Amino acid sequence: MLRRAILPLTRPSGLVSAPRLSALPVSHSRCYAKGSKPKTPYKLPESVKSSKPEQPAKPSQQEQYAAEQAEFETTSDPQANTANTTSQASSSPESSPSQSEQDAPQRPLPDLTQGIPSTLAAELEARSKKSGSGTLNLTEDPSRFEEDYSDDGRGDIPKGGYESSLDRKRARMAKLMYALFLLGSVGGMAYLGRNWDTVEEENAHPDVPSGWSFGLWYNRIKARMGDFTSYYKDPAFPKLLPDEDPNLRQPYTLVLSLEDLLVHSEWSREHGWRVAKRPGVDYFLRYLNQYYELVLFTSVPSMMADQVLRKLDPYRIIRWPLFREATRYKDGEYIKDLSYLNRDLSKVILIDTKEEHARLQPENAIILDKWNGNPKDKTLVALIPFLEYLAGMGVDDVRTVLKSFEGQSIPIEFAKREKAMRERFEKELAEEQKKRPRSGMGSLASALGLKSSARTLDGEQLPSAGLQEGKMLWDQIRERGQKNYELIEKEIRENGEKWLAEMAAEEEKLRQEQMESMKGSLTGFFGGGKKE
């Protein structure tokens, strides 16, 4: 510590040893200044002169201000107490570009440790300055678009001036693909237009025979393309109903629709979906079952219509149900093509509520109004006498009879015709009885209380006996139909529950068999089947 304190004291002082300039004589100082002055004056370089701004020459005399200065008066207008900035700005010299750049605020340098900064903002700013528009084209104005993006981002490069190797490769691949597609199309058309391979194909298209003309070639292409799309448009099977012996079934086929004919479905917020059964449906089906082969043909999908059919016809009075899968799709409509039924169309009657469903066979159709849920409707019951007459009288072709009722209400018109025929029949019967002499044996037997046998072995009345009693032929047919209907109703009342139980057991048995077959197929697939 003592050494550090003594060390500054031992150092020599500069102020004491340095000679004092003021002590030198004046003559020596003048000689020094005279000797150090250069003989030629020093001139500044031109670069330094140009960099320094020229200072305006100072006025030789100071400006004389007026004794009275209006801007400092307190009583004058405040607006007049302002300096004339415009005059000062005009009188002051313009600032140089270097000075404006120095006065501009300096932006911070980018931090390159965070990556190279984006130049998008600078490019957009330069583009906007070049185009003369300082705002973005938010409204997508076409004029602004052409003005701002007329160069397509290429700048001074012309449109076809540069093409990369990748673009050339893509262009070659595109040309190759187009060529292959064209060759494939031509080859495919030529293959589709070839002659028929088998006799079955040629018989299936009788209007398009084999040949090498352009028209036949085009027709075969069209026919084969139609075969491809027919899988989705035509019915699922070429024969919707199986082949049966005509002696074991009714000779006539009655095809019925479901929606708005037998049932009516509606939706409401309070009850949701509800399905109502039309009045007289049970009587209609059970009565006509003895004359017709009943077929349900609906455009509703099977998953929806099958549940309704189970409730509508629990005793399987309807023999064959057909759903949307059996219809034909054409021009946006589901058509019921009766030619797929595998039945003679002269003995087929279709009852529907839409004319579009019977577009292909309108001569076989009876179009009724849609049932809207009226509980007092009697349309189906009123149609029974006409249908019973067609089947009971054995009409050869139902289409001719239906054509005679075209444009008229069938129940009303048939009632008028039946009344006219009954009046004529009664008149002819009365005239015949007057001409026919009464036999003596008949009068004697009636007097003794004996009646002649005018019935068959099964208890049915002979037609001739019925005619003598004044009954028309279809009156006798109607009586037999009523008796058969009563027998059917009696069987349903006595054995209906038994039939339902048997059908439920049969369905359960089929379901169990299907489950067993599915389990066996799964275990066999994974190698767990039974070893023989």
From Swiss-Prot:
Biased composition annotated in UniProt, kind: Low complexity: 61-106
The residues forming a coiled coil are: none
Query: InterPro entries under this entry?
Result: FCP1_dom, HAD-like_sf, HAD_sf, TIM50
Q: Cite the entry's keywords alphabetically.
A: Membrane, Mitochondrion, Mitochondrion inner membrane, Protein transport, Transit peptide, Translocation, Transmembrane, Transmembrane helix, Transport
The FCP1 homology domain is annotated at: 247-390
Ranges of Polar residues compositional bias? 131-140
Q: Which GO terms describe its biological process?
A: protein import into mitochondrial matrix; regulation of mitochondrial membrane permeability
What are the transmembrane regions? 176-193
The segments annotated as topological domain Mitochondrial matrix are: 33-175
**Location within or outside the cell:** Mitochondrion inner membrane
Q: Does the keyword Transmembrane helix apply?
A: yes
Provide the GO MF annotations for this entry. Answer: identical protein binding; mitochondrion targeting sequence binding; protein transmembrane transporter activity
Mitochondrial intermembrane compartment residues: 194-532
Identify the main location. mitochondrion
Cite the residue span of the transit peptide: 1-32
Compositional bias annotation for Basic and acidic residues = 141-157
Q: How does it sit in the membrane?
A: Single-pass membrane protein
Write out the function statement from the record. Essential component of the TIM23 complex, a complex that mediates the translocation of transit peptide-containing proteins across the mitochondrial inner membrane. Required to direct preproteins in transit and direct them to the channel protein TIM23, and possibly facilitates transfer of the translocating proteins from the TOM complex to the TIM23 complex.
Q: How does it assemble?
A: Component of the TIM23 complex, at least composed of TIM23/timX, TIM17/timQ, tim50 and TIM21/timU. Interacts with preproteins in transit.
Name of this protein: Mitochondrial import inner membrane translocase subunit tim50
